[in-house]
């Protein structure tokens, strides 16, 4: 029955899996009271001493500052920092900070003036009359953050808790070896700590308030019990010493039996936890009106002559604190910020004290032993047995070493609290915590990159959607403009329609013929004449364009002319020395002669008016002339053996000559008034003219030496000649009075004229013969 009653007691505690019991080593520093350290000459205050973004600077180089004066502005989750003493801002530049890699962060450097003057302080002793929001804002603006090691802004944490917090836990376990800052603070300032707890309770209004403290702090337990003797709203739970019972999840389970869900927060189960040092800082911010400018720091280790706990101003160089405590470094001396399990080694001693600095450990060479070489994992599972978060450190080790980020995430590497228990028990001396920290950093970087990529994709898709909307709107405007033409377009369309209707009305209007009157066709005749004139003008322009475009090559013309002359000479020689066996057709000869003369005249006119485009190469012209002469000689030899064609009827020749003369006169008149339709190639004209002249000479010789085989009827010849002359006169009269509607081909006209002249001459000759 007694055991059953004990099980239902209110102060029941639970135990978590894993954990270790390393040597505590706390007696080196917890036996002496808190003391002040002399001010340093220079303070380095990093702008970021908490989780989250740094604040906005509100001072500049050369400014005079007082203790407690804000150096940055805190907006949102940004936490401000304050001047630790009065002095002058000498620089604002990057400086190495309290970090395992000693990364340089933007810092404000202040040279102290030694006066240590405060800003005007306005404390709220009657904080119970203040609203919850006012208290949270004051805590935030006074720079209060979690002093247990996380550095999370306290005001943000209180704001996030809201009205769902049922249990407020004050973490006083301080389980890591060597560290006694909270122990000494509770011994020397227990009343102030409890007052800070009451301010937090006033803000959160929880149903219960629990203080968790390990049983290895008897003096602190005594002081708290004395202060809480008359208080019934705050319960203190003394728990067994076990590392890491001071972890947030572990202490929550020990005191409440509730487990924080994976990936969640303690506020999800109605629990909010604050550190003892944080409660003390809340009291000083609200009641005393003092921003956080200092904190308790444990100085311990066998390399320090006077170990203990001191009030260290934020921004004080570590070297200054160690020298004040009698630091005696060895050849290979190391200094650890934090405890031996969760702390990190400082690369040098010029880094400043920040809000999360709770211990400076300077061990001797024999105190921690010689560092041993890392060996291969033997899969003994000792790390898994010691893990307080129920993880598999050996598997996480392999995943971290193999860059298998997905598997490490699946095995809940984010739940690792980096307590170092696994590395403490590892027989292979594997620094597991270092591997886990590196893996967490890489996963965080990957997620940050994925987040930026997702944001960039969202911006791109939004831009594409905007462009599509603009394009659709533009197309819609174009469609509207096409459907509804503008006023000017409407006027132009109406004017065009009116002109079309007017033309149609004029075209369909009938011509009325009245009795005794003649119809007036003058308008129609004038329109016809205008169209003819327009057509002739267009044809003249086209002819001028063609004449300008036609270019005669003088070299080819010269060659062809030479060939024609050679052929003509050869033909003359043949006619002079040879007796024709047959009569030559005089009609064909006359026609060809007339054609040749017409072409020759036209060629002379074109050559007189045309400018050659390019100079003739005399060498090429000489070569071509020689070739032409050779061809002419060969032609003479070939024609020496040729026979003439059949005899010609003189009657038909006379008629054709008369017709040719009439047509020639008509052609001359047309050429005087009209422009030729097409340009004649002068080269071909010259060749044909030469050939025609040769043939004409040959024909004359044949006619002079030949006797006609048949007698021509003189009456018929006279009648034909008279008819030809009458037709010629009639044709001349028609050409003199009429305007030609179409252009006449000059070559055909020349041929017809030549034929007419030959026929006329022949008819006259026949008439003379008949009269004789």
From Swiss-Prot:
Localization of this protein: Cell inner membrane
Primary subcellular site in the record, as a coarse category: membrane
Protein name (record): Ion-translocating oxidoreductase complex subunit C
Domain of life: Bacteria
Region called Disordered, residue ranges: 602-684, 696-717, 727-746
Binding site residues for [4Fe-4S] cluster 2: 387, 416, 419, 422
UniProt cross-references to InterPro entries, sorted A to Z: 4Fe4S_Fe-S-bd, 4Fe4S_Fe_S_CS, Ion_transpt_RnfC/RsxC, Nuo51_FMN-bd, Nuo51_FMN-bd_sf, RnfC_N, Soluble_ligand-bd
């Amino acid at each position: 029955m007694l055991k059953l009653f004990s099980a239902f007691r209110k102060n029941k505690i639970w135990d978590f899996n894993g954990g270790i019991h390393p040597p505590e080593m706390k007696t080196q520093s917890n036996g002496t009271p808190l003391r002040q350290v002399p001010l340093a000459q220079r303070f380095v205050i990093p702008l970021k001493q908490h989780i989250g973004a740094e604040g906005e600077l509100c001072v500049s180089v050369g400014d005079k500052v007082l203790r407690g004066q804000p150096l940055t502005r805190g907006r949102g989750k940004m936490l401000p920092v304050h001047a630790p003493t009065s002095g002058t801002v000498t620089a604002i530049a990057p400086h190495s900070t309290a970090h395992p890699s000693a990364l340089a962060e933007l810092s404000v450097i202040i040279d102290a003036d030694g006066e240590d003057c405060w800003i005007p302080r306005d404390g709220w002793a009657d904080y119970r009359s203040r609203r919850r929001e006012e208290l949270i804002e004051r805590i935030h603006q006074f720079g209060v953050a979690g002093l247990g090691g996380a550095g999370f802004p306290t005001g943000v944490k209180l704001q996030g808790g809201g009205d769902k917090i049922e249990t407020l836990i004050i973490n006083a376990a301080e389980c890591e070896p060597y560290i006694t800052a909270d122990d000494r603070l509770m011994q020397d300032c227990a009343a102030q700590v409890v007052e800070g707890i009451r301010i937090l309770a006033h803000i959160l209004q929880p149903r219960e308030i629990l203080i968790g403290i390990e049983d290895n702090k008897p003096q602190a337990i005594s002081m708290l019990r004395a202060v809480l003797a008359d208080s019934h709203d705050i319960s203190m739970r003394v728990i067994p010493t076990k590392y890491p019972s001071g972890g947030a999840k572990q202490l929550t389970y020990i005191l409440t039996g509730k487990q924080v869900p994976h990936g969640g927060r303690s506020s999800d189960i109605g629990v909010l936890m604050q550190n003892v040092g944080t409660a003390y800082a809340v009291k000083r911010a609200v009641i005393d009106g003092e921003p956080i400018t200092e904190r308790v720091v444990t100085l311990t280790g066998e390399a320090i002559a006077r170990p203990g706990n001191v009030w260290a101003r934020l921004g004080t160089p570590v070297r200054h604190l160690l020298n004040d405590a009698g630091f005696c470094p060895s050849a290979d001396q190391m200094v650890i910020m934090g405890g031996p399990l969760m702390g990190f080694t400082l690369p040098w001693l010029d880094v400043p004290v920040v809000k999360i600095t709770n211990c400076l450990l300077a061990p001797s060479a024999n105190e921690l032993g010689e560092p041993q070489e890392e060996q291969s994992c033997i899969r003994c599972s000792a790390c898994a047995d010691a893990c307080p978060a129920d993880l598999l450190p050996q598997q996480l080790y392999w995943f971290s070493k193999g860059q298998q980020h997905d598997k490490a995430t699946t095995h809940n590497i984010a739940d690792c609290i980096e307590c170092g228990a696994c590395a403490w028990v590892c027989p292979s001396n594997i620094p597991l915590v270092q591997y886990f920290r590196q893996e967490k950093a890489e996963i965080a970087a990957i997620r940050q990159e994925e987040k930026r990529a997702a944001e960039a994709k969202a911006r791109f898709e939004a831009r594409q959607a905007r462009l599509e909307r603009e394009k659709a709107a533009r197309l819609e405007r174009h469609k509207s403009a096409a459907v509804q033409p503008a006023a000017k377009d409407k006027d132009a369309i109406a004017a065009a329609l009116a002109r079309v209707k007017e033309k149609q009305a004029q075209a369909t209007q009938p011509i009325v013929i009245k009795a005794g009157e003649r119809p007036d066709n003058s308008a129609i005749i004038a329109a016809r004449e205008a169209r003819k004139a327009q057509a002739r003008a267009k044809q003249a322009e086209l002819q001028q364009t063609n004449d300008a475009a036609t270019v005669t090559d003088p070299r080819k013309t010269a060659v062809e002319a030479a060939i024609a002359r050679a052929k003509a000479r050869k033909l003359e020689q043949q006619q002079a020395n040879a007796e024709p066996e047959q009569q030559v057709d005089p009609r064909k000869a006359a026609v060809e002669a007339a054609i040749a003369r017409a072409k020759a005249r036209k060629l002379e006119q074109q050559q007189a008016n045309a400018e050659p485009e390019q100079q003739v190469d005399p060498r090429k012209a000489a070569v071509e002339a020689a070739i032409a002469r050779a061809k002419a000689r060969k032609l003479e030899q070939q024609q020496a053996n040729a026979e003439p064609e059949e005899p010609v009827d003189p009657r038909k020749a006379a008629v054709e000559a008369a017709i040719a003369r009439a047509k020639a006169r008509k052609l001359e008149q047309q050429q005087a008034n009209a422009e030729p339709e097409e340009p004649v190639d002068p080269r071909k004209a010259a060749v044909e003219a030469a050939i025609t002249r040769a043939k004409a000479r040959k024909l004359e010789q044949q006619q002079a030496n030949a006797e006609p085989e048949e007698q021509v009827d003189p009456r018929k010849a006279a009648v034909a000649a008279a008819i030809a002359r009458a037709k010629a006169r009639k044709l001349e009269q028609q050409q003199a009075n009429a305007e030609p509607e179409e252009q006449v081909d000059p070559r055909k006209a020349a041929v017809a004229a030549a034929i007419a002249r030959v026929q006329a001459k022949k008819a006259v000759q026949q008439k003379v013969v008949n009269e004789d």
